[in-house]
Amino acid sequence: YPGAPKFDSSEFPGPKSQILLKEAPQYESMTRGAGEFPMVFDEGKGVTVKDPDGNLYIDISAGVGVSSVGRSHPQVLSAIESQSKRLMHASDMSNSKRGELAKVISSIAPPGLRDNCISYFAQSGSGALETAIKFARKVTGRNQILAFHGAYHGVWHASNAITTGDQYRSGYGPFMGGVIHAPYPYAYRFPFPLGGKSCEVVAGEYVDYLLNTPYTAA
């Protein structure tokens, strides 16, 4: 929308948005990450979003990656319309479009995987991570997972066990076992004293301790 950002309301959120935000908790869960953020999406075009009150915002989130080419992109809309007339859902059955996409992904994969990999399509990031955990455990025969403090991997059962942060974990335990968390080697707010060493070395030594000391259960 031209002119963004632009605010037509004298208050934020505007009156129409306030009504929707007030009603929302009565009918849907507000446990989403931005569930209480005082903004309502109504329309989107390009890199802009409009709320019910006509206020225009610049979207720098790209719809969490879903709208990387912009909202309401003409080619995307055309593809959605064309495919919806042909086939909207195929459950777990093979279908031509999914097969075409898997072939393209294999052809552009990094060296070593190019034309030598298969795809598994999931409905969400958390779902993809859950599948990756099952796949890794099945293929390797191992059950321990190492993740970094401060990392976000999802909010389903297994993915939530790997994710850290009170806003994601408080009240939902106990979590899946076999998960080990280690500090990321970044000097800003590094949790351990360095003793003259770099944070990369100290973090590496701690990971070595976690993985190679019997009583850490790793």
What are these regions (language model features)?
Residues Y1-K45, A203:
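Active-site-adjacent loop/helix segments that line or gate small-molecule/cofactor pockets in enzymes
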Residues P38-D59:
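Active-site and channel-lining beta-strand-loop segments
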Residues I19, E23, A79-S82, E100, ...:
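A non-catalytic, amphipathic alpha-helix used as a structural packing/dimerization or gating element
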Residues K6-S9, G14, L56-L146:
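Glycine-rich loop-to-alpha-helix module at the N-terminal edge of alpha/beta enzyme cores
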Residues Y27-A34, L87, G112, P214-A218:
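Short secondary-structure junctions and interdomain/linker hinges
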